[in-house]
Amino acid sequence: YVIGFFAAIQAGNIAVPLFAPELPGHTERLDAVLSDATPSVILTTDSAAESVNAFLRKLPRGRRPRVIAIDAVPDSVGATFVPAELDSEDLAYLQYTSGSTRTPAGVEITHRAACTNVLQMILAGGLDTNIRSVSWLPLYHDMGLIMILFPPLCGGHITLMSPLAFVRRPRRWVKQLATESAFGRVFAAAPNFAFELAAQRGRPPAGETWDLSNVAGLLNGSEPVTISAIEKFTEAFAPYGFPATAIKPSYGMAEATLSVATIATDARPSVIYLDRDQLAEDRAVPVSPDAPMAVPHVSCGQVISSQWLTIVDPRTGNELPEGEIGEIWLHGDNIGRGYWGRTKETQDTFGNTLKSRLTQRSHATGTAAEARWLRTGDLGVYLNDNLYVTGRIKDLIIIDGRNHYPQDIEATASQASPAV
């Protein structure tokens, strides 16, 4: 998979990271992506070629791309290979969005955007060329894909395992983090659920000793971050030297290549509690944790180097001050070029300009007046220069003019009965 991805890019093609046809529940998504991307060739392995061909035979003949098993290609073919001349603004790959609420869209990631975001993450994490990584994330997912970009761009070493290996035995991931800690500082990333799962089922067996003291950073993102998952993981592995500052709640998205904001290298994860009634009015008002309407929100820290993140009124395009909830807008060289084959959606999402900026403490300072901004569709707020992500615009449930966040409704339901 890794070889095929980099080979496609070196040959001057646009790579499209995808998954095997037998992945449960993803057949329609795979068909939609193939229809949208219209690839000329599919790279796979000899062992998976039959299932790939079986899937393609279900498609109309005109939509069936050529299939190449890369491990069946003789090494001698490389003797005549001439690398393509690439420009930093050329497309490197298409990162397809999750498609949970719409048809998957291919985000056009240029070489500049990919390299910029990896370097931004290196600087934000205080990492170096000796960094060690351990990843079980799917390579077709933006978080998993960017992990394999670290070694060729910045040096270091990465150990890969399958998602199934982690889900079956979360201990494998944590143990490998400890193993890599013996050789240097360790950096990894995972969605929030993984920390809770590893805390439950990832501890070492009796009599086995691990050393996790060299784990420099574990990004927690790709889904809403909860303080309970962070605390459970930290508490479970503190006896093995796991630093209290290691878990890094983060914010990112495929349209920005991946990473946008995270907490400082020496910071511990932090949580505030906001009044639910005020949230319904688009205001972030901190309250005590035991207040009856308190809703926890974990800080995603600050926007990382050479990016801009501002909170905007989605109806007017005006920048909002601290404490007011609005849409998160992004600007930077790491932002994708647009959506593959979707001109109008690209303009609506990637081609926005701020109608007005704050005269003081503007988070758009340093960008040109005509700068193009990415509308994320996410809702967020700045409090004490920390970013808090409160939800998605499309997910809001509006009743009698008041906003209701689905995650709050889910939390209330889960607290009402242990059976939920």
Can you annotate each of these PLM segments?
Residues 10-78, 191-192, 197:
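Structural core segment of the AMP-binding/adenylate-forming
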